[in-house]
């Protein structure tokens, strides 16, 4: 008669044996062996570490309530996260459209609940994500709104009218208009923790502002063409220019830290997470850089026109192009995962990424929500 040795082991040791297997197919078959195996193979002490191992870059749930729910059913969370990743790999996506702007939509930001969009119609609109309805309109610029960033207190916008406007986000009230750039303001970033705003312009300069006084502290002159995009992480600014270069700057001193060279035509977009810089160019490529060494570690090829916009998280890089496509790349391998062809009827100007969704904006006036959470349950509990 076979002996069920597991019944004689301490339960915690049985858990460790199952974790050592680390093969999902084998673990899933354990429940056929005995009731004891069934209990062990479905225990949260097995599935929580498996979840966090497979998605090791995951950040904590947003609330304690979510954490308490998540701790109770890790096997369900694992199954739903697996489905979400399968949707990404296989391109299982549902598209929804937001219409309301009277002209091209140049920029957007998405926080999971709201979409903010800036347009050639000179306005910024705030959309409720769930209903896709416009709940607030910001009017004040005399030209296209080319860039924006907001938090719960402020929204800051830059325009082709050469100005920057600082808004009270809750009331849509204009706090101040900043007039230091000579040409269009192409990108804007701010960090409320260090009280700094950074702007870049077609006038080839980068300006650093004090968020409290709204005074321009200094101007960075280093690029030889329009500075098309910037990103701010901590005290480091990354700038991308039509002169084909990427520059890293110290926001505290304005000193140049490093130059990244490799693109053969002007740059249109850049993102930075503190360690990695990802850039898109008119040479039709995306480059991934080690910010510490300045080395280009990967080149992503596949777009057939200028790479106008991109964003990334721990697992994916999303890019939008003048070839009318949005592409999703595996950040680790560089493999093209999803190719959303004819995503828009015209140039793609902006993309945002949040968990299982991409938001895109285009010259065709549309905002599109690309939802990869089709069939995924307990989405609010998943840890990204």
Regions found by a protein language model. Name each.
Residues 93-96, 133-136, 173-176, 215-218, ...:
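A structural motif specific to WD40 beta-propellers
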Residues 110-112, 150-152, 192-193, 232-234, ...:
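Residue-level detector of Asp-centered blade-edge/turn motifs that repeat once per structural unit
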């Amino acid at each position: 008669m076979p002996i069920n040795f597991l019944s004689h082991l301490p339960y915690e040791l049985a858990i460790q044996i199952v974790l050592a297997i680390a093969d999902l197919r084998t673990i899933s078959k354990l429940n056929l062996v005995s009731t004891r195996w069934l209990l062990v193979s479905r225990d949260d002490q097995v599935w929580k570490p498996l979840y966090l191992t497979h998605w090791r870059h995951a950040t904590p749930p947003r609330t304690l309530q979510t954490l308490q729910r998540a701790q109770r059913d890790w096997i369900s969370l694992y199954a739903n996260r697996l489905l979400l990743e399968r949707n990404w790999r296989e391109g299982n996506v549902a598209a929804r459209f937001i219409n309301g702007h009277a002209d091209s939509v140049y920029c957007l930001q998405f926080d999971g609940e709201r979409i903010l969009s800036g347009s050639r119609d000179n306005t910024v609109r705030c959309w409720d994500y769930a209903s896709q309805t416009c709940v607030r309109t910001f009017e004040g610029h005399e030209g296209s709104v080319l860039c924006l960033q907001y938090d719960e207190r402020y929204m800051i916008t830059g325009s082709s009218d050469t100005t920057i406007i600082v808004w009270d986000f809750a009331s849509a009230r204009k706090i101040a208009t900043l007039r230091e750039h000579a040409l269009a303001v192409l990108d804007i970033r701010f960090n409320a923790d260090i009280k700094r705003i950074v702007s870049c312009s077609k006038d080839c300069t980068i300006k650093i502002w004090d968020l409290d006084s709204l005074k321009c502290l200094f101007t960075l002159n280093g690029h030889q063409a329009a500075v098309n995009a910037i990103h701010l992480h901590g005290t480091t600014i990354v700038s991308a220019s039509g002169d084909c270069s990427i520059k890293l700057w110290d926001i505290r001193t304005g000193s140049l830290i490093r130059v990244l060279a490799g693109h053969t035509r002007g740059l249109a977009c850049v993102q930075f997470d503190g360690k990695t810089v990802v850039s898109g160019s008119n040479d039709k490529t995306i480059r991934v850089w080690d910010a510490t060494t300045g080395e280009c570690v990967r080149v992503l090829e596949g777009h057939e026109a200028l790479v106008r916009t991109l964003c990334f998280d721990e697992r994916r890089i999303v890019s939008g192009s003048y070839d009318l496509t949005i592409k999703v790349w595996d950040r680790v391998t560089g493999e093209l995962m999803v190719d959303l062809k004819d995503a828009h009827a015209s140039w793609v100007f902006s993309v945002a990424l949040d968990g299982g969704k991409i938001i895109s904006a285009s010259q065709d006036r549309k905002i599109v929500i690309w939802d990869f959470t089709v069939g995924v349950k307990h989405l609010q509990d998943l840890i990204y």
